[in-house]
Amino acid sequence: MKLALRALFLLVIALGSTSLPAQHDNHDGHDHGADDGHGHGDQAGVVHEGCAHDDTYDPAEVILHHIADANEFHFVGDIHLPLPLFLYAPGHGLTTGLSSMLGDHHHLKAVDGYVMNHGRVNRMDDGAGAAMLAGEHDVECILHKTVADDKGKEVDVYYAKINGKEYKLNGASVGDGGLLGGGITNFYDFSITKNVFTMLLAALLLILLWTGVARGYKRNEGQAPSGVQALMEPFFVFIRDEISIPMIGEKYYAKFHPFIMTVFFFILFCNLFGLVPMLPGSANVTGNIAVTMALAVIAAIVAYVHGNAHFWGHVFWMPGVPVFVKPLLTVVEVLGLVIKPFSLMVRLFANITAGHIIILSLISLIFIFGGNGESVLGAGAGGVVGVAFTLFMNFIELLVAFVQPFIFAILTASYIGAAVEEHDHEHGHEGSHDVAHEDLNDGSPAYA
């Protein structure tokens, strides 16, 4: 149990540190950070007429906003739950507080240049001047423009309108080298976002749950399990007998079983929280590529660090084949080492994200058929169709919430089993590892 708790703690820390800089998604998912360094934006503020608000329903914008991370929980209307902010700007220092200090939808504030833009913290460009990047200022509204960057690519740029002037907003710095639309801007966001809060909550519940189960085993030693212990024991036995032992082997499974259990239940709890429309749910944790990447990288590190000479010998100098073929097979095997965690990452991310998008798309039928409130009959028809299909998809999502942790756990166990397998024991469980090797070496979604 202590090993499991340590593994869970390290897992949460790794996930949090990986996902914090990657939570740069804005409300519509376009490139908001990569263009921030371009010279298109008006640096010192430009007088702008009006602050018109477009009430036209945009399903794509709404869907991408709901599956993205945010610096606050939004319930309904103007009801929000603020989250802690830890913002750092080079040359200015650290700014802390709750997200509520930046105001609400009807009364936004700029604090030290930071502005809340559709649930995500942005900062005014350095060209706004020292006076605007310090103290508090009332924000009239957030303006959105689609412009062409230096390469001719259309990007979304946001401006904060203050005292009749507009100031360009930058997204938080993201260490993706611009590959995913991020880049280094004028501030870093280390805040507790919705995803981070949900991960911490899932970790806390897991610690409390399994600590209680451990106490039950000590207190009722030799007796039939009861209460929470009776509820969780089938999960423990199933994962041990159907995943850990078959994939890793009798000799080594006990060492890695706590890690497999931690991964399984962490993903499961995050998935279940994502199905809850309000607190403590609504966060799309496993639908965030940074989180699934961290999980996959951790799984790969655990497997490869414990790889024995037999495993690495097959990777770099495959036995039993002609010498001139060995270099080619080495390239293939090394690629396989990268493809395996990559397939883990994409499989979990794609399945969870697709489910959320489908459900939100079905709900959007109500507003699409209703023509933004112009057609009551259309809204009613959309409601009947949308609700019926949404209920069906929720059942599918609930199934996926359990299936995906199982897939992730069994593939992780197969990677570990292949790494620690000893040559003398190949005949004892070669079937499971051979199947895993054939299905997984090319990264194909054999279990999806």
Predicted regions located by residue number:
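Juxtamembrane interface elements at the cytosolic ends of transmembrane helices
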Residues: 208-247, 307-314, 423-427
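Perimembrane topogenic segments of multi-pass inner/organellar membrane proteins
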Residues: 2, 14, 20-225, 437, ...
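Membrane-interfacial loop-to-helix junctions in multi-pass inner-membrane proteins
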Residues: 4, 224-227, 248-257
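Terminal, Lys/Arg-rich, intrinsically disordered segments and adjacent short helical elements
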Residues: 422-448
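Cytosolic juxtamembrane amphipathic/interface segments immediately preceding
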Residues: 182-187, 239-253
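Bacterial N-terminal signal peptides
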Residues: 7-16
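Positively charged n-region of N-terminal signal peptides that target proteins for export
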Residues: 1-7
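Hydrophobic alpha-helical transmembrane segments and adjacent short intramembrane/lumenal linkers
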Residues: 242, 256-278, 284-424
